[in-house]
Amino acid sequence: MMKMRWLSAAVMLTLYTSSSWAFSIDDVAKQAQSLAGKGYEAPKSNLPSVFRDMKYADYQQIQFNHDKAYWNNLKTPFKLEFYHQGMYFDTPVKINEVTATAVKRIKYSPDYFTFGDVQHDKDTVKDLGFAGFKVLYPINSKDKNDEIVSMLGASYFRVIGAGQVYGLSARGLAIDTALPSGEEFPRFKEFWIERPKPTDKRLTIYALLDSPRATGAYKFVVMPGRDTVVDVQSKIYLRDKVGKLGVAPLTSMFLFGPNQPSPANNYRPELHDSNGLSIHAGNGEWIWRPLNNPKHLAVSSFSMENPQGFGLLQRGRDFSRFEDLDDRYDLRPSAWVTPKGEWGKGSVELVEIPTNDETNDNIVAYWTPDQLPEPGKEMNFKYTITFSRDEDKLHAPDNAWVQQTRRSTGDVKQSNLIRQPDGTIAFVVDFTGAEMKKLPEDTPVTAQTSIGDNGEIVESTVRYNPVTKGWRLVMRVKVKDAKKTTEMRAALVNADQTLSETWSYQLPANE
């Protein structure tokens, strides 16, 4: 009788254990915290030289066999494909599948890939690992799986929604960006991906982050749609003190645009993944910072408490603004970060790096807290990242936003109607918005403007724009020293009512 009771209790315990087992971010956090208490071990490359030294064109020949997509034989709408190691993607990452009862390592096999003309010894690749992975989902049509997430290299990941193409990237963490000591790039060293059910519309991914001075545990919940939203939870532990911690970092590219035209003739009027930094400050102010490709490294810091959101946006999606049939910059998404909870005091920081071509990501934006805990203490950050082409929906409906910033030679119209340059620089800024379009065109809209010590506002005028049903600000400024940057701000008002976001522009140094 006692034996039967013991067996019954054992069976009940087994049933309870199996039904209540669940993998969570806490499992990853235990590993991250343990790593933080140990010395950093740099990842070791196991890559044969034929792959490590290959050119990009050769790396592109290594393709995943779509017929062997992970979960291909399951009814789940999500599928996984993997990246092969090659070039600077020379260290493997571990990838695991999480099911209802267990964690299973997804093992590398060269049979997953076709290698094109890349000559290699099959025995030398049989024990390699994956460089990263991608997620496929029928986001554009029910009968076709399209790539919606790519996790490859350091802590970078790219995400798109319906009708979008890859553009800017997000990252897990940034350390010492733009500091003289040099930037440290943490990397995701291991992933755990939950096997979704047939009816699931979201995919959960966990990641373990490691670097010389920080570790972290991450949970990403990917929700694909017209806008693909990624819900992020992170637990970060410092191994050692850092100069600057970048939370929810975004990385993009800006080469040229109307505010900074191409120095050489180019059939493309604009070339960028993003054209501005948008900030919703803790005090409710909306700020728009047009991007530059400066001649020298530029860092802009916007101090605040408890930010409500920030993002790198691609405003203005008419194909005629880009004219690029190959790279389709008009279809590249904006990324908007919405913090959850109070993030305290800190700054949204924008880093602009000089670049000569579009292959370099030269724009970085992130939140950096004023106070960091001692090494080993846990930091928690929760936020969502929305990848969207509907930039107006990322903005308050009752607040007008900057549709376009154009830079021109300043001039004055003479009595003979000929425009004569007067040594100034003109900025033409168009504001628009749902509520602004409802205003009568004779509304007495004016501009509140200011400029830093290195400049003088010669004239500013505001007039109704019947084409956009918004208002256009024209501001002519005189720069005192072209070797220095010049800061300026402007916002539209009607008496004591603020109508628009704040246009916050930095004119780069000319040399």
Curated annotation (Swiss-Prot):
InterPro entries xrefs: Gal_mutarotase_sf_dom (IPR011013), GH-type_carb-bd (IPR014718), Glucan_biosyn_MdoG/MdoD (IPR014438), Glucan_biosyn_MdoG_C (IPR007444), Ig-like_fold (IPR013783), Ig_E-set (IPR014756), MdoG_OpgG (IPR023704)
GO cellular component, one term: outer membrane-bounded periplasmic space
Domain of life: Bacteria
Localisation: Periplasm
Signal sequence, renumbered to the chain: 1-22
Gene Ontology molecular-function annotations: carbohydrate binding; catalytic activity
Keyword Signal part of the UniProt annotation: yes
Pfam families tied to this protein: MdoG
One Gene Ontology biological process: beta-glucan biosynthetic process
Keyword Signal belongs to the record: yes
Alphabetical list of Gene3D superfamilies matching this protein: 2.70.98.10, Immunoglobulins
Pathway the protein takes part in: Glycan metabolism; osmoregulated periplasmic glucan (OPG) biosynthesis
Function: Involved in the biosynthesis of osmoregulated periplasmic glucans (OPGs).
Family designation: Belongs to the OpgD/OpgG family.
Protein name listed in UniProt: Glucans biosynthesis protein G
Source organism (scientific name): Escherichia coli O139:H28 (strain E24377A / ETEC)
